[in-house]
UniProtKB/Swiss-Prot annotation:
Membrane topology term: Peripheral membrane protein
Sequence similarity: Belongs to the ATPase delta chain family.
GO cellular component, one term: plasma membrane
Annotated protein name in UniProt: ATP synthase subunit delta
UniProt keyword Membrane, yes or no: yes
Entry-linked Pfam families: OSCP
Source taxon at top rank: Bacteria
Keywords recorded for this protein, A-Z: ATP synthesis, Cell inner membrane, Cell membrane, CF(1), Hydrogen ion transport, Ion transport, Membrane, Transport
Family matches, as InterPro entries: ATP_synth_OSCP/delta_N_sf, ATPase_OSCP/d_CS, ATPase_OSCP/dsu
Length: 177
């Protein structure tokens, strides 16, 4: 977990509340995603860690973002720059996404498999996870050849390891004990 999570939470909450109030949640998530990517740029990272005045830093950051930020998004950047918190933007985005998922009663579910799964397999996993979690789910699929076969499903703190690799690791643990 990043060192900026605690710092990011109030900014994310304020942005989310504003976005809901103005019915622009998608737009705000897009703006935050873009701004978070800008902070990851090598040259921008140097500026963020430099000794620029907050106003100069904010205006430079806004200039780089261009049309991607509306007036309200620019105001958020100015406030964060004033408090020397622009490095927390990736965590603000993450917290914003969590707030959105909670408000929409959805959960992000990560599905890792050795090969791409069919639509039928994905819909079965989705239905099973919706039943288990009692909410809508959004599947994020990853391919990891080290899984060998089967799937690993992660939803929050819950992990369901149905992979061959997981079974082999459990078998090795049993044999060693």
């Amino acid at each position: 977990m990043s060192e900026f999570v605690t710092v990011a939470r109030p900014y994310a909450k304020a942005a989310f509340d504003f976005a809901v109030e103005h019915q622009s949640v998608d737009r705000w998530q897009d703006m935050l995603a873009f701004a978070a990517e800008v902070t990851k740029n090598e040259q921008m990272a140097e500026l963020l860690s430099g000794a620029l005045a907050p106003e100069t830093l904010a205006e430079s950051f806004i200039a780089v973002c261009g049309e991607q930020l509306d007036e309200h998004g620019q105001n958020l950047i100015r406030v964060m720059a004033e408090n020397n918190r622009l490095n927390a933007l990736p965590d603000v985005l993450e917290q914003f996404i969590h707030l959105r998922a909670a408000s929409e009663a959805t959960s992000e579910v990560e599905v890792t498999s050795a090969t791409a799964l069919s639509e039928e397999q994905l819909s079965k996993i989705s239905a099973a996870m919706e039943k288990r979690l009692s909410r809508k789910v959004k599947l994020n699929c990853k391919i990891d050849k080290s899984v060998m076969a089967g799937v690993i499903i992660r939803a929050g703190d819950m992990v369901i390891d149905g992979s061959v690799r997981g079974r082999l690791e459990r078998l090795a643990d049993v044999l060693q004990s």
